């Protein structure tokens, strides 16, 4: 679905991201140029458009005039040193042209309910391959999970087997052992945050917030 980098109303201008509507039924608004007193009226028109094209949830990125709107999630940065427990080290296989489709489907399935995680489309497969940082993690032929690294930044990680998160992470960290790693995670992804903290990662700052523009109950405002 087409995004709108510039979406003007009588009250200002925003960008509207619709690419997740077919998958998550979510739309995203980035306020560009709106006076604080006009934010509510501007968002009302943006939300109406998003709902018209099928969005059931509309989120708006952080803006000074959004304090009265309910917080959906915040995105925080975490940093830590890559270290490896040899007892948890498993086999890692890079994604190839033959397996990138499978990797992408697994990633989408595991991230479907994770806030701030983008759905990967078929057109993204070339980018995944060119990055050279997408992997499968196996143990004696059993798929444990997947991961995606960009240098020392963790772009994505997902366990396929229940309880395999530490094994997947230690195996991925073995690829950059000793380096300082960083990642971004939604505050609502509490299970992932607990895992990262167990591995020694610390929150180093809040990057931005998503507020809920629709649905919004009267009591929320």
Residue ranges and their predicted role:
Residues 1-53, 112-123:
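N-terminal charged segments
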Residues 2-14, 130-147:
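Conserved beta-hairpin
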Residues 28-39, 152-165, 185-186:
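A short, internal acetyl-CoA/4′-phosphopantetheine-binding micro-motif in the GNAT/acyltransferase core
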Residues 31-91, 207-212:
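Acyl-donor-binding surface of acyltransferase catalytic domains
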Residues 36-48, 161-176, 193-198:
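Conserved acetyl-CoA-binding loop-helix of GNAT-fold acetyltransferases
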Residues 56-65, 161, 182-193, 209-218:
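Conserved beta-strand-loop-alpha-helix junction that forms the acyl-donor binding cleft
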Residues 63-74, 166, 188-206, 216:
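Conserved active-site alpha-helix within GNAT-family acetyltransferase domains
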Residues 86-118:
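Short amphipathic alpha-helix that is part of the acyltransferase structural core
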